[in-house]
A protein has these predicted regions:
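Long, non-catalytic architectural segments outside compact domain cores
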Residues: 1-55
């Protein structure tokens, strides 16, 4: 099973690629926003996991 951090990281990459391929500006903006949101979630999951291990 894929971890949350890995899933969010993968989705961030997918959305960045979609943003680069988008034809319209609204689509590019939307995919870039999703990429940013998924990247933040991946970072949060990683930080939470590190905190749990060191506690």
């Amino acid at each position: 099973m894929e971890s949350n951090a890995r899933y969010y990281s993968r989705r961030a990459v997918e959305e960045r690629m979609k943003a680069q391929r988008a034809i319209t500006e609204p689509a590019r903006t939307w995919h870039a926003k999703l990429a940013h949101d998924f990247a933040e979630r991946a970072t949060a999951c990683t930080e939470t996991a590190k905190a749990a291990v060191s506690a």
